[in-house]
Amino acid sequence: MLRTSTPNLCGGLHCRAPWLSSGILCLCLIFLLGQVGLLQGHPQCLDYGPPFQPPLHLEFCSDYESFGCCDQHKDRRIAARYWDIMEYFDLKRHELCGDYIKDILCQECSPYAAHLYDAENTQTPLRNLPGLCSDYCSAFHSNCHSAISLLTNDRGLQESHGRDGTRFCHLLDLPDKDYCFPNVLRNDYLNRHLGMVAQDPQGCLQLCLSEVANGLRNPVSMVHAGDGTHRFFVAEQVGVVWVYLPDGSRLEQPFLDLKNIVLTTPWIGDERGFLGLAFHPKFRHNRKFYIYYSCLDKKKVEKIRISEMKVSRADPNKADLKSERVILEIEEPASNHNGGQLLFGLDGYMYIFTGDGGQAGDPFGLFGNAQNKSSLLGKVLRIDVNRAGSHGKRYRVPSDNPFVSEPGAHPAIYAYGIRNMWRCAVDRGDPITRQGRGRIFCGDVGQNRFEEVDLILKGGNYGWRAKEGFACYDKKLCHNASLDDVLPIYAYGHAVGKSVTGGYVYRGCESPNLNGLYIFGDFMSGRLMALQEDRKNKKWKKQDLCLGSTTSCAFPGLISTHSKFIISFAEDEAGELYFLATSYPSAYAPRGSIYKFVDPSRRAPPGKCKYKPVPVRTKSKRIPFRPLAKTVLDLLKEQSEKAARKSSSATLASGPAQGLSEKGSSKKLASPTSSKNTLRGPGTKKKARVGPHVRQGKRRKSLKSHSGRMRPSAEQKRAGRSLP
């Protein structure tokens, strides 16, 4: 869908896509884009990014101040060029041609600028005048043909304008008449939903992705330190944490390596391992972070451990292994439903999310662990890690925890009735109004029928094992009048997916259309979904998220596919949203990738989302990021080359003589080649054993399981979330 400049313009406006973050550049894809045919148009600017809403009033090209491709600086440049041209005209010609010239110059601001300048059709010359509809062009040529030489230095257009208006207008014709000016302004279909997130006929929101990391072994968590460095830390289930820098590179040496302590296995579905990571809100000052992992104690008893650690004073990208201080250990009666989320609330307290202890149906005791307030399993715990407690505890229980005065209840409990919440997040709140700030969202994995999304409330009972989603699971407990459970904000059946992965409310800068959407997914089905709250009735509406077509995602660096198994979601320090997924969910298989969400329909105004990371010294070698996923442009190139080979083969087959030159020599078709790349993850020494816009006239050159897991036993197969 895109086209760059010819080589002499490399490094100019159209060789880069500055709207893409993390240094993703469109590096003069002359050959590639020269192979791509005409595609259906979509809103796109001449820098190949989506249009935007200008932050300030446009004084000159005011038709596009609500939505388009110009900010105030570009608007002023266009106005200056207009007045330079108008100096050549007397008053009569000024009145006759002024509007035409303004209209033509301002098409650079149109949300369809790339189409008006035919910047997408790489098989036709790139224009330096926009495509004009025939009637408008004829009127312009008839009244103002002397202005053409002032608008363009293209020889073909300059030669044609003095002779024949028909020829001139033919040169400015567009293949698709809907996109010529001024028709493009009158087309209801093209303008009805302009600037909104694109939807397919089924109402599925169309987004695109950018690959930012790969070769990871079941990446279960990606977090930032909140210290202004804009690094992100990616934890693998096996127990290794890697540092990624703002330029997209990864440090060769891991931030933390606990492989020798973390309990996990290579078999698919093992939920144990390194499961959670959170940085202290005052990390910049105290260097503290917290981890959640599975382990064996000295007696070989399986436990989950929450520890405090510090970053090395000698290297800000290395943890001090000697600094580990165990905060809490909880014995696990089974090997699944291990929970794993750690986060800090706006109150500064740490929230810990534990699973119900495992097996199917929470069979422990009369009403299970989740409903038992004397057990720490199946709970949301809230503790103060800044102060020590009584009896040698390395944390203090906040005095306003809901059950501190209830006999028999553990005082650290904040909420209960939880099966196995997998991935929770704190809402940053609306960037302007702060609405929603501090809410905690979680995805709770279901048993046999339903997956659910919950809002965590103080003292809330989330129903398990009495209920699963909105439905009864244990009928006796379900009909107990004292249950008084908090219902999910959304639940879905197993026809949609069998293992929910909780996400985030988008509060970033780069994709303003997504603000307020809670984006989450399902591990087993690989589906991406979004919830949006109706502020009037407080109900949540669900919409599916689809990865856009070759039309909507044909931007530099964007892809429209992802690995199936969605393990986790993440938010960077700027608030942009990502998800972590793998094609083979084994803790030892380096098949995991990280993807960033991109809205192709609208971006933030240029410069709004820029930030300057706090410098961080690095001792370890930086490994540049090399994407493995094929971009939409890669796929379009392949399709075009395949069609060209097929056409050439058909031509040769229809008559051998046609394939010979006058000298009788034959032309050979180049055969495509392929290469195999061994996927090697960071720190992996061995491959894991895993299963089956130039001047006118120039051209530009299955895994299946029940309840989200593959399990070694029938009972476990019916129990909890698939990895981790």
UniProtKB/Swiss-Prot annotation:
Keywords: Disulfide bond, Glycoprotein, Secreted, Signal. Residues 1-41 form the signal peptide. GO terms for cellular component: extracellular region. InterPro entries: 6-blade_b-propeller_TolB-like, Folate_rcpt-like, Glc/Sorbosone_DH, Quinoprot_gluc/sorb_DH_b-prop. Glycans are attached at residue 480. Residues 683-709 have a biased composition (Basic residues). The keyword Disulfide bond applies. It comes from the Eukaryota. Residues 643-724 are annotated as: Disordered. It holds the Pfam family GSDH. The keyword Secreted applies. Disulfide bonds join 204-546, 208-553, 424-442, 509-609. It is found in: Secreted. Belongs to the HHIP family. This is HHIP-like protein 2. It comes from Homo sapiens.
